[in-house]
A protein has these predicted regions:
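Acidic, Ser/Thr-rich peripheral helices and adjacent loops at domain boundaries
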Residues: 94-103, 263-284, 353-364, 383
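Conserved beta-strand scaffold positions in the cores of enzyme catalytic domains, especially
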Residues: 154-157, 248, 336, 357
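C-terminal functional extensions of proteins
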Residues: 256-257, 282-310, 314-445
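Residues that form or immediately flank small-molecule/cofactor binding pockets and catalytic motifs
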Residues: 159, 253, 341
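Metallocofactor- and cofactor-centric catalytic cores in central/energy metabolism, strongly enriched
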Residues: 2-205, 211-219, 225-230, 432-443
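Long alpha-helical, hydrophobic tracts
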Residues: 166-329, 335-337
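Low-complexity, flexible helical/coil segments
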Residues: 79-88, 112-119, 159-164, 238-245, ...
Length: 445
């Protein structure tokens, strides 16, 4: 029986990766720039919080959304993914934020795909054939409500011909949540039908998840532990995006949990209704389309990985395909900012992955590499490429300085030392003594 499961390494789609000079005019992902902005390039940032890894910020019910809101007010364009922006029945529209599914974000970072901002998508809805009638009706009412009250372009829905049979578990090696669907073919057939019948170019999927015992989700409701649903949600959306190259996001269907008075605010968004679908439909309605990086995508003014100026991610979650691609890019390398306060169950720190990180904090940090024990003597401070910060307050401050063309170290006491002299290497076949003689003859000292 065919199954879909989450792997660390995923097969790449054979796409054209022709490189082109980045001299074209950048497209805006929000309102037209004012006259004062015409003389500068737009600043683009990427915010990543991996799914199902117990992130201190972003590991619950949309609790990274305030960070995205604050960051979007500083940058011209913010690229992030559903785990950051989805908050069940809550959402926050931000005109300069691009809602990009995780698999697509990885391909974008690797330079394989480009992002094409849109005014509107045609959204289709896939409902798991295993959803009970009453629960299905409630989700259809959500779709109608978003169409009538928000004007969202949700065109048609389809029910899978076979129940998907979602399974979820925690990976014993990494501690992150993951899972599979037993009948991936049923999901792909449903999506293909919507694409061919209704010409949709974005898909929301609602899978029937097993109802948890209260004991299994008690830690999560108290604001600790991991999201048991998130890992397999990523499996589902990855499958659709990999197969059809269109925006996709998932919303689980479950019966409401019993009421509890002792609830962490970070988990509360998932307790206020029968559905997680509103934020998904809202995000997909204007999610960018995914195009292979080629001459056509360049002519359409799409965003490329080389357009990204900075990337923000948790301090010990740096091993994802997208994070590594950005950190190891050879051309137009973005500023990588890791946030110490946002811990996960992973142990993928920059130093373990060979990602050179500058220490921006003035206190002891357990993630600080040994060779960066002193802020003032760090040799990398003259050319900032990766920065470790204490929290998202500092991250946003660093990005504001970076966007303004200001060395962030100039904002700290003793952050700037004396300028250092660079010595040229002797040319091949010419001794240092000969070079000195030539300089003296030319009158240059």
């Amino acid at each position: 029986m065919a199954t879909a499961t989450l792997h660390n390494s995923r097969p790449s789609i054979p796409l054209t990766t022709t490189s082109r000079s980045s001299t074209r005019r950048r497209i805006s992902c929000f309102a037209p720039p004012s006259c004062s902005n015409k003389c500068r390039r737009e600043y683009t940032s990427v915010m990543i919080v991996p799914t199902g890894v117990g992130a201190s910020i972003g590991g619950f019910a949309g609790d990274a959304l305030p960070v995205a809101r604050a960051l979007s007010s500083v940058v011209d364009c913010l690229i992030t993914h559903p785990n950051v922006l989805n908050a069940a029945m809550l959402y926050w529209p931000m005109p300069n934020v691009l809602y990009v599914e995780g698999y697509a974000l990885d391909r974008f970072a690797q330079g394989l795909w480009a992002l094409q901002p849109v005014h509107q998508n045609k959204v289709g809805l896939v409902l798991d054939g295993g959803i009970e009638e009453e629960l299905r009706i409630r989700h259809l009412q959500v779709a109608d409500a978003t169409r009538a009250s928000l004007g969202l372009p949700v065109l048609e829905y389809i029910v899978t011909d076979t129940p998907l049979e979602v399974e979820k578990w925690v990976d014993s090696k990494t501690g992150q949540s993951t899972g599979r669907i037993k009948h991936p073919g049923a999901l792909l057939r449903a999506v293909e039908t919507l694409i061919n019948r209704s010409q949709v170019n974005a898909v929301a999927v609602v899978g029937r998840f097993p109802d948890d015992d209260v004991e299994d989700v008690d830690d999560y409701r108290q604001g600790v532990g991991i999201d048991l649903l998130a890992g397999v949600e990523a499996v589902i959306s990855h499958l659709v995006v990999r197969e059809f190259q269109i925006p996709c996001a998932h919303a689980p269907a479950m019966l409401p949990l019993l009421l509890t008075k002792d609830l962490c605010p970070r988990s509360a968004a998932e307790e206020i209704g029968y559905t997680f679908l509103p934020c998904v439909l809202t995000g997909l309605s204007k999610a960018p389309q995914y195009l292979a990086k080629d001459s056509q995508s360049l002519e359409k003014g799409c965003l490329l990985a080389s357009d990204v100026d900075s990337v923000v991610l948790p301090v010990n979650a740096c091993a994802g395909d997208g994070a590594l691609a950005f950190a190891r890019s050879k051309r137009n390398k973005p500023l990588i900012i890791t946030v110490e306060e946002n811990e996960t169950v992973l142990d993928d720190t920059p130093d373990k992955l060979g990602i050179e990180t500058v220490w921006l904090m003035n206190y002891d940090c357990k993630y600080t590499p040994r060779n960066y024990g002193c802020f003032r003597t760090c040799n990398a401070m003259q050319s900032v490429v990766q920065v470790m910060v204490a929290n998202y307050w500092e991250a946003i401050g660093v990005i504001a300085a970076h966007k303004a063309g200001i060395n962030p170290y100039s904002l700290r006491r003793n952050g700037i030392g004396n300028i250092k002299r660079a010595f040229a290497k002797p040319a091949k076949g010419v001794s240092s003594a000969t070079q000195t003689t030539l300089l003296e003859m030319s009158g240059v000292h």
